[in-house]
């Protein structure tokens, strides 16, 4: 199934769950993961809060600032593209694509164009984020993220419900939920992009975390601060298990 067809199907399903038309256009489910995900906490009260439906939303900027290298990632939601060396004209689709990826527009009737070693860095300035894992492994994650844990039994319904409540407070441009892809965030030439920005992290040291991420990008993303979102609608989806 192509990306456009998949997105149309997802939006139809989101509407069936009671999501408004405007909201469903902004929500993207990146994969078909339907099993539980888990959120670990350092403090017991934090776990109890989520089990009641009080959802602590962090921000990308907060995640970038953590000193612990297994928690913090200064390059969170960054992506770097390098053109390599390409020669051609307007009729060469690969050159046109390399130019587009480099931030260069090639109009009709152009020839003898050379693009060499052009680097473009894309950054998602900030967004609200909730990081969970698909792997309940206290022995691996407890020391870094805490020994208290809440199971979110239906991440799809959780994402939809939290998005609806958040939309009532903040105007959301786009939101996505899915597994993090563990790959280099650099690509070149005609290589496939590593994945959706905000959902790609380097394998070392993160791959063992098996992260499942919820991400909400506000239309106005300046000076975002973490906050507690009261969302009793998800209380029945959140169970304290440790």
Q: How should these model regions be labeled?
A:
Residues 4-242:
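NAD-dependent ADP-ribosyltransferases
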């Amino acid at each position: 199934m192509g990306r456009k067809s998949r997105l149309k199907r997802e939006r139809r399903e989101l509407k069936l769950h009671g999501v408004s038309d405007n909201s469903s256009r902004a929500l993207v489910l990146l994969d078909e993961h339907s099993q539980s995900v888990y959120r670990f906490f350092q403090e017991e009260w934090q776990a109890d809060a989520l089990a009641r439906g009080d959802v602590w939303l962090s921000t990308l900027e907060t995640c970038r600032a953590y000193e612990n290298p297994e928690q913090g990632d200064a390059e969170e939601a960054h992506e770097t593209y390098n053109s390599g060396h390409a020669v051609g004209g307007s009729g060469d689709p690969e050159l046109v694509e390399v130019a587009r990826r480099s931030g260069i527009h090639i109009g009709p009737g152009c020839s003898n164009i050379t693009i060499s070693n052009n680097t473009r860095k894309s950054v998602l300035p900030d967004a609200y984020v909730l990081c969970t894992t698909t792997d309940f492994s206290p022995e691996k994650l407890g020391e870094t993220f805490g020994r208290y844990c809440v199971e979110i039994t239906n991440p799809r319904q959780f994402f939809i419900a939290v998005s609806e409540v958040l939309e009532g407070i903040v105007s959301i441009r786009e939101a996505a939920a899915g597994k993090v892809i563990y790959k280099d965030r650099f690509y070149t030439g005609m290589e496939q992009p590593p994945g959706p920005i905000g959902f790609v992290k380097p394998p070392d040291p993160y791959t063992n975390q098996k992260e499942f991420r919820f991400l909400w990008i506000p239309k106005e993303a300046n000076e975002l601060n973490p906050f507690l979102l009261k969302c009793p609608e998800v209380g029945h989806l959140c169970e304290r298990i440790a």
